[in-house]
């Protein structure tokens, strides 16, 4: 059978896109961790899922991502956010082949140590 003659479709679960986006964001220097999505149902039940901090909306063949991050102290927040946008879009386009409409980055906090005076 020649390539391209198969019938059917490929469905990518939103959880896959969330994992790709989360890992891409965490790979950016200056991202300390993901933050809880405000108003998310997982927060109500005190669960911290592997896809925390990521919302994905898929419309046909286009992806829109919302990422909530906590940055490391001393990081340039604008640079970190722009790098997250670039890395998440690149990862989704490269790994899944879907178009990325937008990557919105919400910086929720700065990760400071609880040790006083350090």
Language-model features, listed with the residues they occupy:
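Contiguous, often N-terminal, cationic amphipathic patches that form binding interfaces
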Residues: 1-73, 77, 82, 98-118
